[in-house]
Each structure stands twice: as structure tokens, then as C-alpha cells.
């Protein structure tokens, strides 16, 4: 189980987007794409075969390394560490993620 998954709310702790809070759009190996974070300008050449591609300069999100983001705890409104523990329900134990500062569970059971 990974510490950061798609849909998690994270805060950027290093880089040009430091302090930005956003949702993780996708996870790529050891990098994450954060909504509205680490914006780059991409130059697109016009393509006559695709009418929707008119070309120009487009702003889009670039991946950030996992070490440059941390989970954002909405209760404490700060970056937080994530731990793992096993919870038992109906005789079946399940591994869940939780915030270490206040023991609040991140995953749904």
C-alpha cells in the first residue's frame, strides 16, 4: 500500500509551488501530479489532422517527486505524516492509512 494515492489532498513542501494545496490527479512510480501545482508552459504545434488541436502555448501540470509533497491534514491544517495500522471488522483485518498527529483514519473502511 502506498502512502500517497490518487484523490489524496497534499501540500507541496519544496520547489517553485511550495505551499500549494491540491488533489493528486495521478501517481507515476515515485512522482505525483498535483492539481494546479508545478504548472509548466507546453508549446504545441498545430495539427491539421486533429481539428481540436489548434496549437499554441498551453499551461499544464508537471509531475513532482513524492519527497516534495506531504499529506495535508484538514483538521490541523498542516502537513502530516502517514502511518499504517490494521483494523479488524467482522473478523477480517484490513490495512488502513492514518494521520500520525491525531490518529484520524484516511481510508474508508
Curated annotation (Swiss-Prot):
Signal peptide start-end: none
Domain of life of the organism encoding this protein: Bacteria
Pfam families assigned to the protein according to its UniProt record, in alphabetical order: KOW (PF00467), ribosomal_L24 (PF17136)
Gene Ontology cellular-component terms listed: ribonucleoprotein complex; ribosome
Sorted UniProt keywords: Ribonucleoprotein, Ribosomal protein, RNA-binding, rRNA-binding
UniProt entry tagged with the keyword Repeat: no
GO MF annotation list: rRNA binding; structural constituent of ribosome
GO biological process: translation
Family note: Belongs to the universal ribosomal protein uL24 family.
Assembly description: Part of the 50S ribosomal subunit.
Known function: One of two assembly initiator proteins, it binds directly to the 5'-end of the 23S rRNA, where it nucleates assembly of the 50S subunit. One of the proteins that surrounds the polypeptide exit tunnel on the outside of the subunit.
Name assigned to this protein: Large ribosomal subunit protein uL24
Amino acid at each position: 500500500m502506498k502512502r500517497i494515492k490518487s484523490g489524496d489532498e497534499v501540500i507541496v513542501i519544496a520547489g517553485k509551488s511550495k505551499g500549494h494545496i491540491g488533489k493528486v490527479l495521478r501517481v507515476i512510480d515515485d512522482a505525483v501530479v498535483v492539481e494546479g501545482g508545478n504548472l509548466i508552459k507546453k508549446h504545441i504545434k498545430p495539427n491539421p489532422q486533429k481539428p481540436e488541436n489548434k496549437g499554441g502555448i498551453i499551461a499544464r501540470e508537471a509531475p513532482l517527486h513524492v519527497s516534495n509533497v506531504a499529506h495535508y491534514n484538514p483538521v490541523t491544517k498542516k502537513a502530516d505524516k502517514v502511518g499504517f495500522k490494521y483494523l479488524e471488522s467482522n473478523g477480517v483485518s484490513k490495512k488502513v492509512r492514518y494521520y500520525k498527529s491525531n490518529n484520524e483514519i484516511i481510508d474508508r473502511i
